[in-house]
Regions:
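Alpha/beta enzyme core
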Residues: 1-302
Length: 302
């Protein structure tokens, strides 16, 4: 026990670390290309190791107790009663769920069974997943992401874990693209809010081209900008507003903590978004990426 106590300590299994060190394909970039069971295997390995450490130390104490004189038994029993377990909370990164909500549920269930008590999930498209600090990220509409948050919650509840923790990460700040246009049934609903951030141009039916995707926004007919890859583009400068909406909806639909991924440490930017989030959810709690890929000294000096 390097810190002499495990109080407020935990293990965090990040996706980029698993991809780099635990994939059978060899070191991979942080793009969810590693086997989805790699994280499960590492959770089980670590959890078993920590339990074995407990068994070793407690076994030694009980042997001491059996062999001790009557006058020494009280102090040994006190050490047993106040024994601090090696087992600490394990936080597991499930990336974007490695598939749809059903796949997310099945993988989350395996992670929890292996020993995870907290699961982090992000709103990127699973098969377009990028490292949080890279460009070219693609997000999914809120309905898709909330379905995956619910899938993780169902996995916890099915296994009898009522206090399992879900961290909802938004990559919207650095994501300029979406895989699809959100389904919307009425003006102002969540799908409509998501689509309102799209980069569009007003058109009329006569100027529409064959194969164009057209939307009605208010009284206007608009054409969202679509790339040759069939991805749709958000308007520049909408990242912060999208992050705020992501966080509010995630917390309102099953997430316990929020994670706003940024390209560099920017305390004022994070603080501004949190103020807006807490106008709606006063007790919102943020986790932040203390990433080794950030040059913390340089950024704080700047």
């Amino acid at each position: 026990k390097h810190f002499e106590t495990n109080n407020k300590k935990y293990l965090y299994l990040s996706g980029w670390m698993i991809a780099a060190l635990r994939s059978e394909f060899g070191p991979l970039p942080d793009q969810s290309m590693h086997e989805k069971t790699s994280v499960v295997s590492l959770i089980a390995e670590l959890y078993q190791f920590l339990r074995q450490a407990d068994a070793r130390e407690l076994g030694g104490l009980f042997r001491e107790l059996d062999a001790a004189k009557e006058s020494d038994k009280e102090s040994i029993q006190d050490r047993i009663d106040n024994f601090e377990t090696h087992v600490v909370p394990i936080i597991a990164d499930i990336d974007a769920g490695f598939g749809n909500e059903e796949a997310t549920y099945l993988l989350a269930k395996q992670m929890i069974e292996a020993g995870a008590c907290c699961i982090q999930i992000e709103n990127q498209v699973s098969d377009e997943k990028q490292c949080g600090h890279q460009d070219g990220k693609v997000t999914v509409p809120h309905a898709d992401f909330l379905a995956k948050i619910n899938a993780v919650r169902y996995a916890f509840l099915e296994l009898g874990v009522d206090d399992g923790v879900i961290v909802a990460r938004t990559d919207s700040l650095g994501a300029g693209l979406t895989k699809q246009i959100a389904v919307t049934n009425e003006k102002g609903d969540l799908g409509d809010q998501y689509n309102s951030f799209l980069d569009v141009e007003e058109v009329d039916q006569d100027s529409a081209n064959h194969g164009d995707v057209l939307m009605k926004q208010g009284d206007k007919l608009v054409r969202p900008k679509r790339l040759p890859s069939n991805l749709f583009q958000f308007r520049p400068g909408t990242g912060e507003a999208r992050c705020i909406l992501d966080c509010i909806t995630s917390l309102q639909n099953g997430a316990d903590l929020i994670w706003i991924e940024t390209e560099k440490p920017h305390i004022a930017q994070i603080g501004g978004m949190m103020k807006e989030i807490r106008k709606v959810i006063p007790n919102a709690k943020l986790t932040y990426n203390n990433s080794p890929s950030f040059n913390w000294t340089l950024n704080f000096r700047q």
